Every structure is written in structure tokens, then in C-alpha cells.
């Protein structure tokens, strides 16, 4: 079962993500990947997550939360080191970059 999940999610992600992009392993990496591919837009508010020290990751997390692409864990925490299963990467990517019908 696990082997099938790994194969299927990797195939999907290799098709979805930009060429050469690593599959994000945590929430911070996923926020950065989405934000970078969206053109690094400025968030509406100053980054508010106390647990995100890196300036770019803080902007990415804030912007993703503002856009409803990713959820904050609380009003002031994002949990950037939190593990992100591959199916969540697929869901988040599809939410950020929906395919035209």
C-alpha cells in the first residue's frame, strides 16, 4: 500500500511542480515554493508568525495564509518545520494554481 502511495504521488508531483523543483518536505518549503512560483507577491500585512525566522519564508507563509492557500496553525504560528505529506503538497499546489477547465 505504502509503495503504491509513494509511486502515485511522486508521479503526480513530477507532473504538477515546476521542472527541477524538489518535493517540499515541510510547510515552510511548500509555502516558499508556492510563493516563488506565484511571482513572490508582497503579503497585504506584515508577516505575523513568531515561529518563522527567515524573511522570505515569513513573507511566503503570510501570503499563503492570506490567500487561503495554507492555514496558519494559530494566530501567530505557522509551524514551518511541520511535516507535509505528499497528498497535501498536491492539494495545496492545486489550490494555488488551479487548472483551467
Feature locations, PLM:
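Feature responds to low-complexity, polar/acidic, surface-exposed segments characteristic
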Residues: 1-59, 66-87, 95-101
Amino acid at each position: 500500500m505504502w509503495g503504491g502511495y509513494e509511486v502515485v504521488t511522486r508521479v503526480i508531483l513530477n507532473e504538477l511542480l515546476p521542472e527541477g523543483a524538489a518535493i517540499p518536505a515541510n510547510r515552510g518549503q511548500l509555502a516558499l515554493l508556492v510563493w516563488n512560483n506565484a511571482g513572490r507577491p508582497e503579503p497585504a500585512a506584515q508577516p505575523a508568525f513568531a515561529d518563522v525566522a527567515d524573511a522570505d519564508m515569513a513573507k511566503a507563509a503570510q501570503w499563503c495564509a492570506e490567500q487561503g492557500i495554507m492555514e496558519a496553525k494559530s494566530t501567530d504560528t505557522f509551524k514551518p518545520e511541520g511535516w507535509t505529506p505528499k497528498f497535501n503538497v498536491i492539494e495545496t499546489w492545486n489550490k494555488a494554481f488551479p487548472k483551467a477547465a
